[in-house]
Amino acid sequence: MRRTLRCLTRWMVLPWLAVAALAHAQAEEPRFGIRNAFVEPRGGVWQLNAILELGLSRAAENALAEGVPLTLILDTEVSRGRRFLPDEDVAELQQRWQLGYDGLAQRYVVVNQNSGAQAAYASLGEALDALARIRELPLLDESLLQAGRRYEVSLRATLEIGGLPEAVKVLLFWREWSRVTDWYTWSVRP
C-alpha cells in the first residue's frame, strides 16, 4: 500500500515538475516577435515599416560565430475581407535577409537576398538592430487597392539557420534552430 501511494505521488508530481521546467525554459528564451508594424502610401506605393524583436538563442549565436549563417524571412500578406465569399488575396511578399559572420574581417554581414544589398557591422547587436528595423519596404502598388475598402495586412517573421543540409537539421534539436512569430495583423483603409 505504502509503495503504491509513493508511486502514485511520484506520477502526480512529475507532470507539475515538467510544467515548471518548461515555464522556466520559456522565461529564459530570448524574445522573438513583431513589436510594431504599419503601412503608409508614398509615391503611389504602399510601404511597410516594422520593428522586430530578434532575440537569438545561445545555440544560434554559437552557430553564427562558427560561420553558419542565419536567415530572417519576412512574410507579408494583404487581403480584402468579403462578407459571403472567401477573403480575396491582394498581395503576398516574402523578403529574405541573411546574417553571417566574416571571421577574416571580424564583421557581421547582413545581405538582403531579394536585392543583393549588403552592410557590415562591428557587433552582433548592431547587426540585429539593423535587421530589426524594417523601413519603407515597398509592399504593393496603390492601384491594387480600392478606396474606402478595408484590407487586412498580416506579417510574420521566421528566423532559421542556413547553410546546413536538411538531413543534419533533422538530427539537431529543431526548436533551437528555427523560430517563427505569430501573424501580426492590422487593418488599413485607403
Name what the model sees in each region:
Residues 139-190:
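Glycine-rich, aromatic-bearing surface loops/beta-hairpins
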Residues 9-20:
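Bacterial N-terminal signal peptides
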Residues 1-7:
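N-terminal secretory signal peptides that target proteins for export/translocation
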Residues 25-70:
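N-terminal onset of structured domains
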Residues 48-52, 103, 114-116, 124-142:
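A beta-strand/beta-hairpin structural motif
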Residues 60-125:
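Structured domain cores in non-transmembrane regions
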